[in-house]
Every structure is written in C-alpha cells, then in structure tokens.
Amino acid sequence: MYSAEISRKNPGCFIFLLDQSASMEDPFGGSSDRRKADELATIINKLIHNLSIRCAKGDSMYDYFHVGVIGYGQDTVVKSAFDGALTGKDLIPISDLANNPLRIEDRTKKADDGAGGLVEQTVKFPLWFEPRHVGGTPMSSAFKMAAEIVQRWVAEHPKAFPPS
C-alpha cells in the first residue's frame, strides 16, 4: 500500500491513450448513429471535466493532477492529442487543462424533476477532444511514448503517488 498523498506538492499523474485509428469509425455497440470515436471523445471529455471539478474549490483550481493524452492512428503518428492552446504539450497541470478547452458546447441531459420524472436540461459541456478515426493502429509506439513521459514525470516527482 502506498502512503503518498495526492496534493499540490505531490500531484498525481494520469496518462490516457486514445485510439484514433480508422477502426474507430465503426459503429459503437451495434448502434448505427454513434461511432466508437464519438463515444471515446465524449468519455475523455467527461473524464477531464470531472477531474477539473474535483480540483476546483470556490474560484480556485488546484493542481492535484497532471494529465497527458496520447493519440495514435492518424498517418500512424503517435503524439500528444491536445489541440488549440495545448497543442504539442504532453503533460499538463489540471488548471491549464480546465482553462483551455477547444470549445464549450450546449448539450442536453436528462435530470430528475423532483416529482419522480425526468426533464431535459441544457448544460454547458467543455470539449478538449474531437472524434478522430484515420490511419493505422501504432499502439506499441503509444505505450512507448507514455513510458517516456512517465519516466520523466517520476524523476520530477519522486515522492508522488504512482502514475495511473
């Protein structure tokens, strides 16, 4: 069992590998209207949004986590999957990530109406990643890149909780 505590002095590290190859254009779970790439983008965007919320206290954002996202597929290229202001960065403090989505979209979700039913609500949803589905699947190269990033991060944070 690890005794390291995640804090601003000892942040945690998350690295996500996103398959962005041509196979991600396939339907998700037998559905004809949602592709695997669509679901993956939604999931990673929700996950980053939830991590951001967990690190917010009032108007302040605390860097409890550093996050890396590696995309692999397009032209068999393996690289940081961030776009916009974060292009080319491989590991980002959560505050920088939270403050730099590609855009914010209006989405509809169902919520409890307080009387046992559901009502649709429009919510703001930050997007960091768009669905992509091009090229081959250089997964082993993605793992190699992740290992290099983790090795560098661990050297910089020797007392931190192990990366996930």
Indicate where each model-derived feature is located.
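Divalent cation-coordinating acidic motifs and surrounding scaffolds
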Residues: 25, 42, 52-53, 63-65, ...
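Acidic, polar low-complexity linker/tail segments
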Residues: 1-38, 151-154
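Generic preference for well-ordered alpha-helical elements
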Residues: 11, 37, 41-44, 136, ...
